[in-house]
């Protein structure tokens, strides 16, 4: 053991890092600690599967849209809640080798995929423990994220609270959500209406939007230009390697969809894809009445529940012409 490694080990011991590593609070900051979601070096050494038929990218909309369980297809869901388009692109660049020639790359298109999202420490933290080489999945603040991942006591009050809970035997998983695993919608109509309004209000605050039908703000226009270039790079990356990129717009409930005016959809969704200017297949389920009118397929006004995900996934695969057994 080198002197540097010995010093780091001593520092981690006396800072409580080894105990903090065991806490649910610490584990909840990262994706794929079990190395089962992404085919990093740990996954590749433990699995023989290769030549996958399909992967999907995306943020929360993609995470809660696709479920390949029980379907005779080799596929992976690489979406996270949240996940930026840059992170989608970098995940694909690192892990695309798992795809077979001609494999599908489903790119989930959400209402604000065309606007850039500000990122911070926690965005970089998510991917720190993926076993990869080269450029990090989220390069912004990555070095700081590495330090905080190694020495979580740097989070100060949060770390101390987590450590105390652990030592008192009160450590509980803090990232488990039962709602997405349900086969029904736990919300009634009034709750769904309020939930939809919360999403609309949250998006307006996040992106500085007063009126969805108004022109883009200067900041969002700059973000749009960046996202246009990034999507072009992602599409070109797929096509240069013989993969088939596909845009997929998942459905939402009528409670939320009614706020998507034609002007809003053109400005934030279809206008963005037109600006990208690539000839990509678009599977658009935003107007699909089977999904839009059936609240029981969701766990809130926005995201599909387990039953909805399985139904939607089969529908997408069938529309791609993939034969299911």
Regions found by a protein language model. Give the residues of each.
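C-terminal regions of proteins
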Residues: 262-263, 267-325
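Membrane-proximal basic amphipathic "stem/tether" segments
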Residues: 2-31, 141, 145-167
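Active-site segments of SGNH/GDSL-like serine hydrolases
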Residues: 235-260
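A general structural motif
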Residues: 51, 100-104, 242-244, 279
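Membrane/wall-proximal cationic-aromatic binding patches
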Residues: 10-80, 85-95
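Well-ordered, non-membrane alpha-helical segments in soluble/globular domains
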Residues: 89-91, 224-232, 262-272
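Membrane-embedded segments
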Residues: 56-57, 61-144
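Secreted/periplasmic serine-hydrolase-like ester/acetyl group-modifying domain
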Residues: 122-241
């Amino acid at each position: 053991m080198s002197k540097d490694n010995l010093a780091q080990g001593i520092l981690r011991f006396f800072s409580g890092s080894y105990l903090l590593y065991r806490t649910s609070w610490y584990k909840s900051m990262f994706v794929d600690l079990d190395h089962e979601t992404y085919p990093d070096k740990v996954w590749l050494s433990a699995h023989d599967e290769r030549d996958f038929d399909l992967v999907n990218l995306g943020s929360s909309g993609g995470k809660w849209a696709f479920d390949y369980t029980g379907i005779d297809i080799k596929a992976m869901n690489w979406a996270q809640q949240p996940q930026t388009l840059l992170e989608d692109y970098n995940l694909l660049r690192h892990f695309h080798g798992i795809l077979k020639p001609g494999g599908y790359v489903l790119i989930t298109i959400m209402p604000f995929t065309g606007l850039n999202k500000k990122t911070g420490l926690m965005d970089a933290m998510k991917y720190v423990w993926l076993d990869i080489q080269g450029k990090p999945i989220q390069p912004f603040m990555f070095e700081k994220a590495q330090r905080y991942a190694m020495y979580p006591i740097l989070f100060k009050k949060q770390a101390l609270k987590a450590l105390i809970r652990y030592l008192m035997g009160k450590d509980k998983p803090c990232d488990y959500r039962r709602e997405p695993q349900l086969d029904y919608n736990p919300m009634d109509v009034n709750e769904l209406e309020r939930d939809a309004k919360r999403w609309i209000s949250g998006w307006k605050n996040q992106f500085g939007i007063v009126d969805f039908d108004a022109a883009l703000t200067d900041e969002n226009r700059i973000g749009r230009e960046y996202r246009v270039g990034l999507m072009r790079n992602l599409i070109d990356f797929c096509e240069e390697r013989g993969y088939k990129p596909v845009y997929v717009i998942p459905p939402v409930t009528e409670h939320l969809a009614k706020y998507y005016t034609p002007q809003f959809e053109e400005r934030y969704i279809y206008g963005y894809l037109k600006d990208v200017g690539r000839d990509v297949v678009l599977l658009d389920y935003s107007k699909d009445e089977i999904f839009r009118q059936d609240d029981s397929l969701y766990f809130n006004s926005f995201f599909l529940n387990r039953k909805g995900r399985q139904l939607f996934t089969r529908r997408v695969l069938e529309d791609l012409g993939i034969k299911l057994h």
